[in-house]
Amino acid sequence: MVLNGAELLLYPTAIGGEPEDDGFDSSDMWQRAMIGHSASKQIPVIASNRIGTEKGIDIENYFYGRSFVTNHVGDKIAEGSRDKEEVLIGKINLSEAETLRNVWGVFRDRRPELYKGLLNLDGSE
């Protein structure tokens, strides 16, 4: 998305407890995965997540919230709680993000023309 001009990544999610193991809390892993997108692409991430409990006939699922905003290097600059609806505000500098992408080799030296084989199941271009 960044290669196509995106300046922010928005991730609306509905992630929470695992019905098979209600003691398992994946919220830290979920945040690290989203933060990895921010750091590797030098782009701010805004990740929203549901809160509360949803009850079905034979199942109940808990959504752990913890929505957050990162800056362009993956630092969390705002984070929500687990149990209440909130509006998060974070100050993001898009020009700093663009400058870093042009300077730091992780993004600058990408060669997307070589990725074509990854787009097909058989690896052909």
Where are each of the predicted segments found?
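A generic membrane alpha-helix/interface feature
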Residues: G23, E60, I89, D109-R111, ...
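CN hydrolase (nitrilase-like) catalytic-core segments centered on the catalytic cysteine
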Residues: V2-V87
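Cysteine/selenocysteine-centered motifs that mediate thiol-based redox chemistry or coordinate metal-sulfur cofactors
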Residues: L3, A97-E125
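A short, polar/charged loop-to-alpha-helix boundary motif
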Residues: K84-N102
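A sequence-level detector of short, solvent-exposed, charge-rich linear segments
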Residues: G16, E20, T53, I57, ...
